[in-house]
Structures are given as structure tokens and as C-alpha cells.
Amino acid sequence: DDDFSKAGSIAELTDWNIYSPLWAPVTLDGKWLRLQDKDPFDYAKVERKIPASKELKISFDLQAGQNDKGTLQIDFLDENSIACSRLELTPDGVFRAKGGSRFGNLMKYEPGKNYHVEAILSVTDRNIQVFVDGKRVGLRMFYAPVPAIERIAFRTGVPRTFPTVDTPADQTYDLPNAGDQEPLAEYRIANVKTSSVDKDATAAVLKYADFSHYADYFNGMEDENIAQAIPNAKASEWMEENIPLFECPQ
């Protein structure tokens, strides 16, 4: 679970891979992780590594600053960053899902409005169910088979596939309109939560700070009358550095 309001700076989001170019910056804005983009040749991107899951539930809050420009793609990927499914906010104001070689429209979206998005992905059934504000808006097949889902990426543009292995090494031309900017597009995400419903689900790593008060309570129950290698006053600090906490699937 990611609560961005608890982060003091973008550097504290150590569980995320963040790609933040000058004209497509990623910043924190209160509880929101904000992705902006005015670069016609690049994009902002954030990616979260999660425990490998064959049956995955994910939820997040989503807000678009506009619905007449910009693109936000949400990819669900395996360990090799191969995407099996994609959700997308288009510059035409449509929230859609990719299935096979085609997209299926889910709903229209409005600028500045908060949406609570939930998705259930099944590697076994090769499909994704999408819910917005508690209402099911679509079911789409995966467009690529994957053994498990291990990453979630939010990106303000389409994936780059150029250059290829056959692209000439020497280029004697500039890209058209190099140096120009596009109108600014902005997207915000918050409260990203994932859970695996696999029968043999991989346990999620928990944040020690959420449980440190238990260690402090037990360490303070009795006076420390025997000197230890790690005194009670330092026990919680040592545990945070050396003992990871895991959520045990039921």
C-alpha cells in the first residue's frame, strides 16, 4: 500500500522506479503523485515492483487535469516488463482498456474529477475486470500471455519502440519541430494498493514504522536489569535495519 501523503519528498519513494525528465516531471502534491508532460518526444513514468501474482487485485485513485489532450497509460507487466494488459486515458476523454490488438471503451472521464479505480487481473483466465467508483465498467482479455504480474507502470505516453536493431547507426537529420513543447497535460494518482489472491500468494513486505510501537511496548514492559548486546532502547532501531516484516496470506 502506498500513501504518498506520508512522503516528505520524491526521494523517499524508494519502492518506486521514477523517470522524470525536465519537460515531463514527476512530483508530490499532498496525497497525490503528479505526472506532468509537455514533451512531444518523452514522457513521465513511475513503476512499482510488487510480489509476483497470478491473481491480482489493484486499486488506486486517479485524476486527470484535462480530457482534451495528453495520454496516460497504465501497464501491468511481468518480471521482464512484458505488458499483459493496459488501461488508458485518451486525449479524446475516453477511459479504455486494450484487449488483443484493439481497445475497448470503458467510460468517459471528466477533468479534475477523482475516480477510484479497481482492477482484478487473472493470469489463469487471461483477463482483467475494471471497476470505477464501485461500478464494473468492463472485462477485457489480456493481449499477451505472462507467467505472473510483477510490475505496475503509469506513463504519460506510448512505449518507445524506436530505434530498432535495423535502424542505421548514423543519422544526418533532426526530428521535426525539435525543441517545441506540447500543451501541458497533468495526471495524479494516489492510494495505490495491491493484493494477491493466489492460493500460494507471495507475502508482501510491510513497513516497519507501522508496527514499531509493538516492539517499543514490549521492550518497555520491564526494567532492563541485564545488559544485552542490543539494549532495549536500541532494539527497535536494530529490528528495522535487520528484520523484514511480511504479511502472511490467509
Language-model features and meaning:
Residues D29-A97, H213, N219-I226, N232-Q250:
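Secretory/extracellular carbohydrate-interaction modules
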Residues D1-I18, A190-C248:
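Extracellular carbohydrate-recognition regions
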Residues F131-K135:
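Short strand-turn-strand beta-turns centered on an Asx-Gly dipeptide
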Residues R96-E118:
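Short, aromatic/His-centered strand-loop micro-motif at the edge of beta-sheets
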Residues E47-I58, L106-K113, P183:
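Extracellular/lumenal carbohydrate-interaction signature centered on repeated Trp-anchored short motifs
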Residues R140-R188, A203-V205:
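Flexible glycan-contacting loops in extracellular carbohydrate-active proteins
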Residues F60, G112-V123, I128-V130:
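Short tryptophan-centered beta-strand motifs in secreted/extracellular beta-sheet-rich domains
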